[in-house]
Amino acid sequence: MGLNRFMRAMMVVFITANCITINPDIIFAATDSEDSSLNTDEWEEEKTEEQPSEVNTGPRYETAREVSSRDIKELEKSNKVRNTNKADLIAMLKEKAEKGPNINNNNSEQTENAAINEEASGADRPAIQVERRHPGLPSDSAAEIKKRRKAIASSDSELESLTYPDKPTKVNKKKVAKESVADASESDLDSSMQSADESSPQPLKANQQPFFPKVFKKIKDAGKWVRDKIDENPEVKKAIVDKSAGLIDQLLTKKKSEEVNASDFPPPPTDEELRLALPETPMLLGFNAPATSEPSSFEFPPPPTDEELRLALPETPMLLGFNAPATSEPSSFEFPPPPTEDELEIIRETASSLDSSFTRGDLASLRNAINRHSQNFSDFPPIPTEEELNGRGGRPTSEEFSSLNSGDFTDDENSETTEEEIDRLADLRDRGTGKHSRNAGFLPLNPFASSPVPSLSPKVSKISAPALISDITKKTPFKNPSQPLNVFNKKTTTKTVTKKPTPVKTAPKLAELPATKPQETVLRENKTPFIEKQAETNKQSINMPSLPVIQKEATESDKEEMKPQTEEKMVEESESANNANGKNRSAGIEEGKLIAKSAEDEKAKEEPGNHTTLILAMLAIGVFSLGAFIKIIQLRKNN
């Protein structure tokens, strides 16, 4: 057990080591190139560079402030402006915008001027929005639009806000708030309608792109359209609000809920409604139920009278070929009177004619068929023959049964007798077979004979002799002689006694017993003892089979002669029993030794196998762990 546990633990360690070191290239990403080396500083730099990137869910437009700051940085880089004030730079850009658009200037300068004018107007609208809204307009119309915006920016307050963009005034704040609220929906719609090609959005990562942008765009447009429609129709908006408020009040008010629940269930019906709803009472046994004076929906009709039952029941059929006489007082539960003598004569004539129509073959075939069907039932009597039907036949009486020869009973070794069969035989001896035929359900009367037939007796079944002996001894008990012999012992009865005892004289104690005639015993091979003839059941005793009949009490001399024989038999039996027990014990000891030896052999065979598997597992673990260690050292050197 200890080796098995150790082996399991080593296997667990081996599996975990394989899971860690089976492919170290995946974990450490070991390559020979310098670019892919394990430098943690480079990874941190990449992370810091990726952090400022923002998620771009659509086209992004630069504000005027961002455009102006970007233009100033570009001018400083190009060495055009050095050590200048921000206010002077803005004034210079404003003067360029007042002179009008210059076609020779590049697109970047035009966008810069437009962004400055947009900032002067005080609104956070995109600088390139006009050109994007109307891409087909000529440059002259775009210049006119710019001039209009420039005229709006001529107020002193706007110039102050332009000079100090970081500190806007209160008037500027209010104006910007109003314009931003007014143009919020328009700017959102315009920004969603712009294409990705015209804008310059920042590149997004693959894992940060929006999911189904077209679907989200359509949902947003639909929501905006619904909101606009509701704002245009205040009546619809008011109706929606009122409806929702009414539903909430109806759900939260307890009184309203109780009224709704009460309205769902109708009131219970009254007795009159139930009586009208129930169908009429159906006809019972062919007559209508009488109408009650006080109708009720849960009342049963009264029971019928004798006259109603007599009229409802059919007429009494013919019984045994004659009609029942009409009685003066009709009753539904009255049997017909017994037949008269004339009717009995008619029955006998018809029975004799029917009896003559039957043949022997018909009765034999009928008896065979019934025997085949009733062979599974031991208590069912066999079909009687023609002689038994016409009269008593070969049914034995109690005296004939007692005087039967022992050879008439067939006795086999496998035959068994139950208590029911013994009781049946006793009844046959005393009272005949009437009780048996009644229990079996056989009809004692014969409809085909002119006179009643007595009860029929079944054929005597096979029965063992000892059971019948015990039954007869119950009826006529007798005293057994006091001798040490065991008469019914199976071991002693199998051996034949060669020495015959001498006849003894009658003792005075057994003088009252009836005198019996000694008879010769007969031995049969492979069969149990049989019964000898009985002349009269109350006057004759039973002779024991295969043993001498002892009619008198044994004297002391006889007892002394019988003692050696019994002692020899008992010694032989004890010796044979001891020999058998000794053999059984020795056989059991040998079997136990063989089982122990086989278990030791199997254990010895299993031990080398366990050792070999353990050694192989440990070798495999060592090889894999060594390889993993070498690989880790190489990776550390490369880093």
Curated annotation (Swiss-Prot):
The chain crosses the membrane at residues 613-633. Residues 1-29 form the signal peptide. Residues 190-210 have a biased composition (Polar residues). Residues 264-333 are annotated as: 5 X approximate tandem repeats, Pro-rich. Its main location: membrane. One of its GO terms (cellular component) is plasma membrane. The keyword S-adenosyl-L-methionine does not apply. Residues 62-71, 423-433, 553-572, 588-609 have a biased composition (Basic and acidic residues). InterPro entries: Virulence_actor_ActA. Sequence repeats lie at residues 264-298, 299-333, 334-378, 379-417, 418-422. It is found in: Cell membrane. A motif (Cell attachment site) lies at residues 360-362. It is a single-pass membrane protein. Residues 36-71, 132-212, 285-308, 320-341, 372-459, 474-610 are annotated as: Disordered. Residues 41-52, 409-422 have a biased composition (Acidic residues). This is Actin assembly-inducing protein. It comes from Listeria monocytogenes serovar 1/2a (strain ATCC BAA-679 / EGD-e). The lineage of its organism: Bacteria, Bacillati, Bacillota, Bacilli, Bacillales.
